[in-house]
Amino acid sequence: MTIQSLIVTIGSGGLVGFALGLLGGGGSILATPLLLYVVGVTNPHIAIGTSAVAVSANAYANLIAHAWKGHVWWRSAVIFALVGTLGAFLGSSIGMLIDGQRLLLLFGLLMAMVGLLMLRGRATAPHAEQHQTVLRMCMKTSAVAILTGAASGFFGIGGGFLIVPALIFATRMPTINAIGSSLLAVGTFGLITTLNYARHDLVDWTIAMEFIVGGITGGGLGTLLATRFSASKHLLNRVFGLIVIAVAIYVIWRSWASLVA
């Protein structure tokens, strides 16, 4: 490990953390491309497994801040996280069976979808009472939890862009509570994915720790600037959406070129 590679890895983690802190979501989807094409990880599966470590750590760190502010609806969050772990385990198990370049091609298509969603802006939901019929809430939450957990595990991503609207759909909770509550699931799905990949030696722990250090530093800076640029939040989301789409095109091109070579 050279000083240059250390700086590149921490810097890449810092970019992801900065985007997460500034925009509140979506940034973690850049982790795998950065690990592959900037840090220099050659195995797509190791890149996915390693990014899952960073995603999980950053999510749990942000969960503490949201919980302190009272943004977490714990009943819905716990149900979603626990049930979704089954989906995350199945999704990550299937993902490891797929050829790395084919998985990257699908990942690039997913990135393009996320970029388009960021261009549209985050959906909102009307205010709802927290206390619903327990059976109804559990059934709706469990169903979407398994699906989003599977997608999160399959691609090794946080999946906040999937989990937030899923929680809103299942519980009708306000968006700020969905964001805070989603972090428990994001962290847990990332942890399950990490453990599953680690069983097959598909996690580079050294790079993961360096990436996390950068993510925490960048996240702190992004959070500080978030308030200052709050009036431009929608514009920032759209600009970042364009960046995600551009990276998606590159990922699709690289993976497709490898498949047809």
Curated annotation (Swiss-Prot):
- Topology relative to the membrane: Multi-pass membrane protein
Per the record, the major location class is membrane
Record keywords, A-Z = Cell membrane, Membrane, Transmembrane, Transmembrane helix, Transport
Q: Which Pfam families match?
A: TauE
Q: State any further remark.
A: Part of an operon that comprises bigR, blh, XF_0765 and XF_0766.
- What is stated as this protein's family in its record? Belongs to the 4-toluene sulfonate uptake permease (TSUP) (TC 2.A.102) family.
Protein's name according to its UniProt entry: Probable membrane transporter protein XF_0764
List the source organism: Xylella fastidiosa (strain 9a5c)
